[in-house]
Amino acid sequence: MKIAVLPGDGIGPEVTREAVRVIEALGLGDIEMKEAPVGGAAYKAYGHPLPPETLEIARLSDGILFGAVGDPDCDSLERHLRPEQAILGLRKALTLFANLRPARVFKGMEDFSALRPEVAGAIDLLIVRELNGDVYFGEKGFRTAANGDREGYDVMSYSESEVRRIAHVAFRAAMGRKKRLCSVDKANVLETSQLWRDVMLEVAKDYPEVALEHMYVDNAAMQLVRAPGNFDVVVTGNLFGDILSDQASMCVGSIGLLASASLGERETEYGTFGLYEPIHGSAPDIAGKGLANPMATILSAAMLLRHSLGLEVAADRIEAAVAKALADGVLGRDLGGTAGTTEIGDAVLARL
């Protein structure tokens, strides 16, 4: 089993270090972790945010543990050389098409949510977002109409095969949870969404144990605030998923607890190849000070073990240890506590 560790910039190296410690402490044996530079750190050393050697290490792995990229020193570089291009390059080169964003309020964390504690406490959902299609990747541009009026346009489109592959990811995720899947679209006005809904219904026949429901995106946004506990797995397109996943993040209350996965088409010997990262950025203002909360990265490592290495029990152990540490009051500064990066890592290790 091979894990590519790409720490990146800012607090990336600090938080990935704690996640690596947790993986090592599990005593799983046959896991090889190989570190490689990425982002601004890679540009400064090799002249490119995603060196060929780093990409090759990523390709040969079963899963990637990614820290964060972003360096103020690189802000004046040409766009293709900026640190952020590393993650975009990895997604494209490795055909990562399915973003998994869990949103869970751990016991004792209810007051950090923007919602009432009794509502927030019920949140435990997973948003599955398609990454490679939709309006972000359609034809776009500017044009001048016959009357001289300037127009901007972006074409929203999905192919049946694109919808089908994300549908299978979502149904499989639902099979491992409460067997409930909500497909979010806008089929009452968009042809793209009508195709989306048709394909979801077809794929549902392969998963008779999963209860599928459909919801318009405007209603989904309301229900996510009104009764988030009613959701288990949510699957949606790129644009809607971009918005809903950030909304779900605020329902949780702190990005320091939010992990994510981007899965590809390749099946490894143990699971599905993917890239795993916290949703927070590189936070250069606190880099190197031991202040960053590594829990999101540790939870990302748990997702890697579950989805790419097939180590469900090990992933459960990590998540339980994080939950116990939070319940015991081990809080980073993002949660109003005083615990530093290493202290939080030690607390999780002690509760494995």
Swiss-Prot record:
InterPro entries: IsoCit/isopropylmalate_DH_CS, IsoPropMal-DH-like_dom, Isopropylmalate_DH
Disulfide bonds: none
The keyword Plastid belongs to this UniProt entry's keyword annotation: no
Coiled-coil region: none
Enzyme class: oxidoreductase
Residues noted as binding NAD(+) in the record, renumbered to the chain: 281-293
Cofactor(s) needed for function: Mg(2+); Mn(2+)
Annotated site location: Important for catalysis: 136, 186
Gene Ontology cellular-component terms listed: cytosol
Catalytic activity: (2R,3S)-3-isopropylmalate + NAD(+) = 4-methyl-2-oxopentanoate + CO2 + NADH
Binding site residues for Mg(2+): 218, 242, 246
Cofactor remark from the record: Binds 1 Mg(2+) or Mn(2+) ion per subunit.
Binding locations of substrate: 91, 101, 129, 218
Keyword field: Amino-acid biosynthesis, Branched-chain amino acid biosynthesis, Cytoplasm, Leucine biosynthesis, Magnesium, Manganese, Metal-binding, NAD, Oxidoreductase
One Gene Ontology MF term: magnesium ion binding
The protein's Enzyme Commission number: 1.1.1.85
Quaternary structure note: Homodimer.
Name assigned to this protein: 3-isopropylmalate dehydrogenase
Species this protein is from: Novosphingobium aromaticivorans (strain ATCC 700278 / DSM 12444 / CCUG 56034 / CIP 105152 / NBRC 16084 / F199)
